[in-house]
Amino acid sequence: LREPPIFVCIHPNCVPRFPELPHAQMIQFSLFNIPVRVLPWFWLTLAFIGGVLRADTRSEIFELLLFMLAGFISILVHELGHALTAKHFGKRVEIVLQAFGGYAAYSGGGRLSRFQSFLIIAAGPAIQILLGVAALILVIQVEGLSPYGKYFFVKLCQVSIIWAVLNLIPVLPMDGGRILETLLGPQRLRLTLQISIAVAVIIVILSLVYNIDMLLPIFMGLMAYENYKSLKSISWM
């Protein structure tokens, strides 16, 4: 089972197929006995979102690197929330950070109850929001932070809280959509898909009307389309 990517909130099946890069360029490590893989496209898309095309001066490039570090920590902590909770329930887990986000994969163990599934899904955005709040408290309370230090923790706060909140939008396959699916139950999958499509379309319209960053309506449009295909497929069953 794959969790949806985080920082742009788009499922692996909904993103363009990026060419495979040599595994030598992949970062691999273990954290809390959980394998973690960071694919090269993760850094490239994170740099794009951070404004690499606008970074001209040495200071702007350094700020971009700090933003990428903040994004990496925030997304990794989010996925650890999913993974550690799943591991607590006896699952084998792995974390992958890829283009436009990441996911926690888990398998094995016994069948999860709806409440256990809810806890696994909710743990990601919950711990990410706590990380953002901790970064905000640090910025407010700690005196003597360097300008770059303050910039880093402000960005860590922003990306953690904003991305976690976006990921709680009730649109499949984001965490909010998964929570809705868990609460309504498998018998109401059609209703979950209908709600996901409606919310995604509303967000696309509002994003275009209020000229919000184009990434959000693009990805919401993709998710609306994927959910529509899923709805059509179960209609034939």
Model-derived features: where do they sit?
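Intrinsically disordered, low-complexity Ser/Thr- and Pro-rich stretches
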Residues: 1-2, 8
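Intrinsic-disorder/low-complexity peptide segments enriched for small residues
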Residues: 2-3, 19
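Hydrophobic transmembrane alpha-helices and their immediate loop junctions
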Residues: 8-237
